Amino acid sequence: MLVLASASPRRREILSRFIREFQIIPSSASEECSIADPREHALELARRKAREVYERLGKKATVIGADTVVSIGGKILGKPGNEEEAFRMLKTLSGRMHLVTTGYCIIHRGEEHCGAVVTEVKFRELDEDLIWAYIRTGEPMDKAGAYGIQGKGGLFVEWIRGDYYNVVGFPIEIIWKLKELGFDVLSR
């Protein structure tokens, strides 16, 4: 049995493109983390999520945990707590390059297979009216860095260097790792 330890509809949608059958069991692990390094922060939270669900299921499943963070100048931008915070985040990203890092942990037959994927994203210059119009859509409120590249937030992106799916929150490297672990990732 394969389990995705996430309630994210974006992660579910990407995984379903490659794996026909899996279960979704969101992790209840704490997402409080004082690790400042974006890569280590994302890896720690991914491990926590995977381990919590793996233990809850009695160590009888393959479990995928993932966590995505946006960072700029080494500072992590999480999910905005309110519209003003979303505005500040988007204003900070405006006209600048930032990093999107997804840490993942797959627990398969008792062994942890963990990694992190980093994608560079460059935003266009954004004026305040455009930022507020985007915030009013509600789209940025549940996303790290206050934007979703797969939605209206994609308008802000000038270029990316790396894995697009990583920016969405579920890098293709996870699918490749599942293939290496023996999962059929191409049958439908």
UniProtKB/Swiss-Prot annotation:
InterPro entries: ITPase-like_fam (IPR029001), Maf-like (IPR003697)
Reaction(s) catalysed by this chain's protein: dTTP + H2O = dTMP + diphosphate + H(+); UTP + H2O = UMP + diphosphate + H(+)
Gene3D superfamilies from the UniProt entry: 3.90.950.10
UniProt keywords, alphabetically: Cytoplasm, Hydrolase, Nucleotide metabolism
GO molecular function: dTTP diphosphatase activity; nucleoside triphosphate diphosphatase activity; UTP diphosphatase activity
Pfam (any one): Maf
GO biological process, one term: nucleotide metabolic process
Job description of the protein: Nucleoside triphosphate pyrophosphatase that hydrolyzes dTTP and UTP. May have a dual role in cell division arrest and in preventing the incorporation of modified nucleotides into cellular nucleic acids.
UniProt record similarity statement: Belongs to the Maf family. YhdE subfamily.
HAMAP family membership: Maf (MF_00528)
Protein name per its UniProtKB record: dTTP/UTP pyrophosphatase
